[in-house]
Amino acid sequence: MNITKHAFERMRERGFTVEMLGKILRMKTIRRGPSKEEGSSRIVAKVDGSYWTLIVTDDMKTLITVRRAHEDEEQEAREG
């Protein structure tokens, strides 16, 4: 997966590692939802004990940004 400069900077700021990204991408089931921006999707997943939100291109080739999941996103992910 390609990582934008913006995403790389956010990863560094927020303590999200390339290894954590790999763990999410290797999950058997990745639930994607719509994002506010056209052409992108939102992935919410738990990795290393915390829930994270990844914004990726619809083709899953590029990570646009990453942040800790909001409370409602975390709840959605728990309910599956």
Give the role of each language-model region.
Residues 1-80:
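Ribonuclease/tRNase effector modules and their secretory precursors
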